[in-house]
UniProtKB/Swiss-Prot annotation:
Induction: Strongly up-regulated in response to viral infection by the Drosophila C virus, alphavirus Sindbis virus and Nora virus. Up-regulation increases between 1 and 3 hours after infection with the Drosophila C virus. Up-regulation increases between 1 and 6 hours after infection with the Sindbis virus, exhibiting a dramatic increase at 6 hours. Induced in the fat body following infection with the Drosophila C virus.
Gene Ontology BP, a term: defense response to virus
Keywords carried by this UniProt record: Antiviral defense, Secreted, Signal
Protein purpose: Probably involved in the antiviral immune response. May have a role in controlling viral load in the adult fat body, after infection with viruses such as the Drosophila C virus.
The protein's name in its UniProt record: Protein Vago
Compartments, record wording: Secreted
Top-rank taxon: Eukaryota
InterPro entries in the cross-refs: SVWC_dom, Vago-like
Signal sequence, start to end: 1-23
Amino acid sequence: MESISSMIYLVAMMSLIIGGSQAIPYRPSAYLYNQQYCMDTLTGRQLYIGEVFTREDQCVRIQCLETLQLWEDSCQVPKLTQGNCTPVPSTNPHAEYPRCCPLYECKSYESNSGGTLEQTNIYDHYGTLRSSHLTEMIVIDGRTPPRGEIHTASARKYQV
């Protein structure tokens, strides 16, 4: 009798296990809510995967990658070889990246017998030419007047 009751108990337990596992609906892991984010340690800001922001008072763009790592983009100094180049600060340093990056103004001079040619090129932080300006200073009379002699135009008198 004892073996029959233990057999019934065993069959009942097996049916509960088999029936219970079929009652739990299958749910693929993609449907489970999994909160994953990156943490910017400088600002304490949490970023979800793919989210991007520009750090305040820094011209740096931060992005959260799928690997839960932060990617930082900052302004580069381009390798410019023509002319004397100086950085020109952004007119709006609180703008989003890359608008907050400085531009670079490069001036070059070329002299000839007729005058001087000044070329001003403006580049962005990638080294892409944004604008170019050409100024030519022409020498009309290369001779210097003798001392004491000042050339002036004749005065015109008008009556009202």
